[in-house]
Amino acid sequence: DSTVQTLGIDSYRELQKAMNSVASEAAKSVVEVIGISGEQDWTEESYDNKNSVSGLIIADNGQELLIYGKTSILRDTKEIHIRFADGTTKQASVKKKDESLGFAIYAVAKSSIAQSTWQQISIATLGSSGSVQKGDAAVVLGKPFGYAGAVGFGTIASSRNELDGDDGSYPLLCTDIGAAEDGTGVIINLSGEVVGIIDQGISGNSSKELVTGYGISGLKSEIELLSNGQAVPYIGIRGLDVTAEIEAQGIPEGVYVRTVETDSPAMAAGIQSGDIITEAAGKKITSLSAYQ
């Protein structure tokens, strides 16, 4: 005989309490990155809230606290400020940015951060988005609903879609949680690990109103490069893998170039749509992921 398990109200309360605890701890690594224009007085809290995005504390290099976030706040910005989980605000600078994907590392001098703030913040733990499955619990933090400091609970609706970007493809995570059109933030699992970076700008029309983000595993190499002040390599192609079926037709194994970005290094090198890339920097290229 099959046994039907029911979730009583007490069990639900315990589950909700546990999820809130995970969210509260993970929120210590989430900040608000604020772009200040000359006309705005940040000391009077009068800046435009639309000129801010969520950021994630990802490293401490000994001198600076490093924060990963979108570059959209940099337009017409004269100063950058970081608001930490305890509500304190400190000035920041851009350490390195990737214009192609639209993310940057922002740096805050450790010497400017008070001891009381250190007790309320933490460095994020990055998980693996590759292990995320459809139906898994999802917690969203940051500014997914258009205002900072939010938290939402739901499930992963899709974990197998990808976004074709410059020089590679990026895994996407889509949830069943409603989102603001310009939502930013993070997706965490029940272990408190960050598995996704929310960017509603990449949502398709059908999922525009649902929290969507990059799987963190596809961003780790970029985060490491930017954190070290290094540029993310950019060639400027969008391509597809040459599958076994295509290879059987006499086309060499590699990456098929679908499009070439205007004024890109690829265009300058003479690469054209329809070309097959089989080697780069002396190494054989067998797939788009290997090329990336």
Would you name each region that the model predicts?
Residues 1-52, 79-81, 103, 112-117, ...:
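N-terminal targeting leaders that route proteins to membranes or the secretory/organellar pathways
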Residues 12-21, 37-70, 89-91, 123-125, ...:
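A conserved glycine-rich beta-strand in the N-terminal activation segment of trypsin-fold
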Residues 18, 22, 190, 194-250:
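C-terminal cap/linker of serine protease catalytic domains
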Residues 30-34, 65-70, 131-144, 175-176, ...:
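Active-site-proximal beta-strands of protease catalytic cores
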Residues 47, 178-181, 227-291:
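PDZ/PDZ-like groove recognition
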Residues 60-104, 109-111:
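Catalytic-histidine neighborhood of serine endopeptidases
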Residues 93, 113-147, 177-179, 213-217, ...:
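Active-site substrate-binding loop(s) of clan PA
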Residues 111-123, 152-210, 247, 251-259:
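Active-site region of chymotrypsin-like
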